C-alpha cells in the first residue's frame, strides 16, 4: 500500500485487525508491505483519517490488447440478456484511461477512473472480455477477481514499448519535431476542388448509399 503525504509524516494503515506504519521521505512518498491476506471481503481499510470501504482481497489480472480487449459489454446484451441482471459484487473492473505519453512512465494515472463492481448499476461500464473472464474465474474458485484493463483499439505494439527498448530499433525512432509537423499537417485537409462554388458537376454520376 503506497501513497503521498507531507515529507516526514507518519502514516498508519489499519486493515483486517492489524496496523502498519511508515514515514514519508523527502519526496513525500510512503509505502507499507502487508503479509499475504486471506481471499475475501469486503473489508475496511483506514489510512490515518481516510476510510476506504468495500475492499476485496483476491486475484488481479492485467488485461491488455486492442479492440477485442476493449469491446464494451453493452454491445453483447442482446446475445447475453443476463448481463442486465448481473449482481456480483465480488468481481471488479478498472479501465486505465488513455493517455498520450511519449517519453517516460507516469507515476499517476490521468482521469477519474475508479474500480467498479459487477452489479447491474455498474456492469455496463465493463469491457466484455474482462467481465466474462472474471465471472468464470469467480464461479470456479470462489476468490474475488479484479480485472485491470489497459487496452486501446487499433494501437500498434510500439505504443506499448518504452523508448529505452525502442532505441534498439533505429528505424522506429522518429524525430520529435518532424513528428509534430506531420501531425499538424494532417489536420489541413485543404479546400478541395469539389468545394469550389463554380465547379461544374453536371457530369457527375449517381450512386446508391450502402444499406438503402
Question: Where do the model's predicted regions map?
Answer:
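Cell-envelope and extracellular/periplasmic
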Residues: 1-212
Amino acid at each position: 500500500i503506497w501513497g503521498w503525504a507531507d515529507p516526514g509524516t507518519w502514516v498508519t494503515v489499519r486493515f483486517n485487525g492489524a496496523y502498519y506504519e511508515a514515514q514519508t521521505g523527502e519526496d513525500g512518498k510512503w509505502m507499507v508491505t502487508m503479509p499475504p491476506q486471506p481471499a475475501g471481503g469486503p473489508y475496511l481499510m483506514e489510512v490515518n483519517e481516510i476510510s476506504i470501504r468495500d475492499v476485496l482481497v483476491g486475484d488481479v489480472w492485467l488485461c491488455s490488447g486492442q479492440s477485442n480487449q476493449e469491446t464494451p459489454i453493452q454491445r453483447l446484451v442482446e446475445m447475453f440478456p443476463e448481463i442486465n441482471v448481473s449482481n456480483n459484487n465480488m468481481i471488479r473492473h478498472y479501465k486505465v484511461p488513455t493517455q498520450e505519453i511519449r517519453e517516460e512512465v507516469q507515476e499517476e494515472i490521468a482521469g477519474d477512473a475508479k474500480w467498479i463492481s459487477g452489479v447491474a448499476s455498474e456492469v455496463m461500464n465493463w469491457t466484455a472480455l474482462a467481465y466474462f473472464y472474471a465471472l468464470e474465474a469467480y464461479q470456479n474458485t470462489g476468490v474475488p477477481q479484479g480485472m485491470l484493463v489497459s487496452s486501446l483499439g487499433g494501437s500498434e505494439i510500439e505504443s506499448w514499448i518504452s523508448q529505452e527498448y525502442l532505441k534498439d530499433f533505429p528505424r522506429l525512432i522518429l524525430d520529435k519535431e518532424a513528428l509534430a509537423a506531420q501531425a499538424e499537417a494532417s489536420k489541413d485537409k485543404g479546400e478541395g476542388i469539389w468545394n469550389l462554388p463554380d465547379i461544374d458537376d453536371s457530369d457527375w454520376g449517381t450512386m446508391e448509399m450502402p444499406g438503402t
